[in-house]
Amino acid sequence: MNGTQFIARILKEEGVEQMTCFPSNALIEEVSKEGIRPVMFRHERGAVMAADGYARSGGGEGFGTVMMQHAAGAENSVGGLSQAFGDNVPMLVLPGGYPLAERNIRPNFAA
């Protein structure tokens, strides 16, 4: 079992039924295999706003879940995330990433 499979399984066990996303994240295929419905968006902020709406419409049950690509994708989502944070909307945000070995910066450091 790798990291994405592990995360997908935990999300399923926690009751996640759908996840909004921008189509550039390795987790998308794994959540699909677990029976979680990925809902694709053309922009990260739209995906965040949909997850926000999903959480708000649940009547206090559950939370919104959104994933996007790293770097610019995470930056594009900040406006929607700020609004959700300001309104205390429960949301899980999973920005993607890439292996440290692919950064081409030696030595590789991780905080």
Predicted regions and their residues:
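N-terminal alpha/beta PP-like core and its mobile active-site loop of ThDP/TPP-dependent enzymes
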Residues: 1-111
